[in-house]
Amino acid sequence: MNRICHIEIDQTSPIPPTAEIEQERQVAIFDLLEENSFALPAREGRAPAEGPFRLTLAIREGRLVFDIRSEEEETVGEFHLSLGPFRQVVKDYFQICESYFEAVKRLPPSQIEAIDMARRGIHNEGARVLKERLEGKAEVDIDTARRLFTLICVLHWG
């Protein structure tokens, strides 16, 4: 079964996340574990590793790290992605999220809906960038990419 069965965020930031960011993290993890598609392609003449997988996301030396293990915690693989392609979309996503969280407190539903549509658009762009960056390393569907993008944002800014 090619899916993620456990996810861990290796958060080394000394600054605790805000309540909103922690909520986003918890929802993304819950949704990701409920339904996801995560497969590793065949590499170097070897058959593809079979899931389910345990995934740890971390930032080390300025790079996004995917540490992938079997359900029995045996190392399956690890790959690193440059954070450069994510910087602008993560920044945009957090700016629109701040606007959204403020809007929920004081604006009418029609204005909240407009901000939420923009937020979803930026979120979709982040998922698209992630899918592109994962090409040849891991295969994910768009919903899994969206949830992983949320966790990358939390890791990056949390």
Swiss-Prot record:
Domain of life: Bacteria
Family of this protein: Belongs to the UPF0262 family.
Protein name: UPF0262 protein RHOS4_22360
Taxonomic source organism: Cereibacter sphaeroides (strain ATCC 17023 / DSM 158 / JCM 6121 / CCUG 31486 / LMG 2827 / NBRC 12203 / NCIMB 8253 / ATH 2.4.1.) (Rhodobacter sphaeroides)
Lineage of producing organism: Bacteria, Pseudomonadati, Pseudomonadota, Alphaproteobacteria, Rhodobacterales
